[in-house]
């Protein structure tokens, strides 16, 4: 049996190294692709507000006979500057609450925006006595520059601002004669949305 030339051996060894390297690179590519991809289940998983307390908000209205009707609702409460700044950014569902109530320490005229907010919302503003001032609908803003997002502002100073899924204000009993107040109790099954 004739001996192969050293050049021929080197060529075969080189080919084996190239094949091994190509296999390793391909395997690494598959591992990286699989390791960094997310399933649609992960991407589509509902994200509700995190790091906020839920509390009962009482909605009272004067009926046509002059009596007061009240209903308790469950809301996420944003009462620190960090919580108010985060609000409903990145949230895809309100979860087991009817909305988020932003509580200011004193009357303010600060505007709201929808930067990085993913769901359409309605907002209602209330004064320091909880009396209804104004309401409007807001649309998500996914602009990379927050300066490109519209601002939503009421002409009056407010202390409370309630954000709910767009169109839910009437369903929750919020209208021009509504008065809201926070009740010192956490949400129960009767006040929490199922």
What are these regions (language model features)?
Residues 35-194:
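Compact, glycine-rich, soluble single-domain proteins
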Residues 1-3, 44:
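Selective for proline/serine-rich intrinsically disordered segments
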Residues 31-33:
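C-terminal motif of bacterial Sec signal peptides marking the signal peptidase cleavage site
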């Amino acid at each position: 049996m004739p001996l192969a030339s050293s050049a021929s051996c080197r060529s075969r060894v080189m080919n084996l190294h190239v094949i091994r390297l190509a296999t390793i690179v391909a395997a690494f590519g598959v591992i990286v692709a699989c390791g960094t991809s997310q399933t649609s289940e992960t991407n589509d998983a509902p994200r509700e507000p995190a790091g906020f307390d839920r509390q009962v908000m009482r909605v009272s209205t004067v009926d046509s006979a002059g009596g007061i009707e009240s209903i308790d609702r469950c809301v996420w409460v944003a009462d620190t500057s960090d919580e108010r700044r985060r609000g409903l950014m990145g949230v895809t569902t309100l979860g087991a609450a009817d909305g988020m109530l932003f509580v200011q320490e004193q009357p303010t005229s600060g505007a709201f925006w929808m930067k990085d907010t993913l769901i359409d919302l309605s907002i209602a503003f209330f004064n320091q006595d909880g009396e209804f001032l104004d309401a409007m609908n807001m649309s998500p803003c996914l602009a990379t520059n927050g300066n490109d997002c519209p601002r939503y502002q009421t002409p009056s100073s407010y202390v409370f601002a309630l954000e709910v899924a767009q169109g839910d204000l009437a369903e929750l009993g919020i209208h021009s004669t509504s008065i809201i107040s926070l009740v010192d109790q956490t949400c129960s099954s009767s006040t929490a949305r199922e």
